[in-house]
C-alpha cells in the first residue's frame, strides 16, 4: 500500500455555488483526509452530489468560500494528484490502449513502465482482450470500466467517481466495485456519489449526506447506517423523504430551517 500522501487533505470551507439563479451548493464545509478508503456521497436527486465532486476537482469554481488542497487553492495543483470519472465518461475515439496511454502522458514514465501500468490497469478492469478495440465499440459497462481503469492508471491520491455504476447490470456493477475496492486497498482515497444505498453500505468507510445543496451529516459509515443524527437523513434511509417534505417542515427559500 502506498504511504500516506503529503498533499491531502482536501478541505471545503463555507463553499457556495450558483447554477443560473439557483444556489446548488450552500455554505458547505467538509474535509477529506489522506486515509485510504471510500467516502460515499448520498442524497436525493438535486442534492448537489455531482456538483460537489466537480468543485473538488476544480472543474467549477465556487461563488463563495474556499477550497484548499494541503493548504493551497490552485486547482491546477489539485489536478496533479487527482483523477475524476464522470457519470458519462469522455473517451477518445481511438483504441482502448490509446485511451490508457493518453492518460499517462503527463507522467514521467519510461516506455516500459508505461506499458506495464497500462497492462496492469486493463487486466484489473477485465479489458485486456479489448486493448486494440476502438473504445466506441465497447458496451456501456465496458466503457465505464475503461474510464475507471484510465483514471486509476495514473495512481491518483484522490479518485473522484460520479455514479460509477449508474445504469449498469449487476455483473458490471460488481466489476466496478471490485476496482474501487482495490484502488482503495492500494492507497487511493475514493470519493464517489451513488443513489444505491446498498452499494454505499458495501463500499463506504465514510458517508456524507447532502440535501438541497447542504451537507447535513458526515459520519463513519457504520455510525451513519446504524442511525443518522439528522432527521432528514433518517427519513432518506427509510425511503420517507418525499413524505417528510410534504409535511412542510421547512419553507421553500434558501433560509429555511431544515433539520
Region locations from a protein language model:
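Catalytic Walker B motif of ABC-type/P-loop ATPase nucleotide-binding domains
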Residues: 159-162
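Helix-to-loop junction immediately C-terminal to a conserved catalytic motif
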Residues: 57
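A short, surface-exposed alpha-helical micro-motif characterized by mixed small hydrophobic
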Residues: 200-202
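Helix N-cap at the start of a conserved alpha-helix in ABC-type nucleotide-binding domains
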Residues: 170-172
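Conserved ABC ATPase signature
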Residues: 134-138, 142
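H-loop/switch region of ABC-family ATPase nucleotide-binding domains
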Residues: 194-195
Amino acid at each position: 500500500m502506498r504511504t500516506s500522501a503529503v498533499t491531502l487533505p482536501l478541505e471545503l470551507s463555507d463553499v457556495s455555488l450558483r447554477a443560473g439563479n439557483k444556489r446548488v451548493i450552500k455554505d458547505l464545509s467538509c474535509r477529506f483526509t489522506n486515509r485510504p478508503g471510500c467516502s460515499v456521497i448520498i442524497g436525493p436527486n438535486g442534492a448537489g452530489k455531482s456538483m460537489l465532486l466537480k468543485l473538488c476537482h476544480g472543474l467549477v469554481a465556487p461563488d463563495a468560500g474556499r477550497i484548499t488542497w494541503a493548504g493551497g487553492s490552485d486547482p491546477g495543483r489539485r489536478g496533479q494528484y487527482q483523477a475524476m470519472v464522470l457519470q458519462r465518461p469522455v473517451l477518445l475515439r481511438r483504441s482502448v490502449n490509446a485511451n490508457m496511454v493518453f492518460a499517462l502522458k503527463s507522467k514521467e514514465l519510461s516506455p516500459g513502465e508505461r506499458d506495464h501500468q497500462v497492462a496492469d490497469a486493463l487486466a484489473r478492469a477485465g479489458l485486456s482482450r479489448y486493448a486494440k478495440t476502438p473504445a466506441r465499440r465497447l458496451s456501456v459497462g465496458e466503457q465505464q470500466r475503461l474510464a475507471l481503469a484510465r483514471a486509476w492508471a495514473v495512481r491518483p491520491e484522490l479518485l473522484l467517481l460520479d455514479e460509477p455504476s449508474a445504469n449498469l447490470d449487476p455483473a458490471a456493477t460488481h466489476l466496478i466495485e471490485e476496482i474501487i475496492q482495490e484502488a482503495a486497498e492500494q492507497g487511493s482515497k475514493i470519493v464517489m456519489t451513488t443513489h444505491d444505498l446498498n452499494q454505499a453500505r458495501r463500499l463506504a468507510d465514510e458517508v456524507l449526506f447532502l440535501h438541497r445543496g447542504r451537507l447535513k451529516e458526515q459520519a463513519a459509515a457504520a455510525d451513519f447506517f446504524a442511525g443518522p443524527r439528522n432527521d432528514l437523513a433518517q427519513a432518506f434511509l427509510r425511503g420517507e423523504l418525499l413524505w417528510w417534505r410534504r409535511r412542510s417542515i421547512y419553507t421553500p427559500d434558501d433560509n429555511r430551517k431544515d433539520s
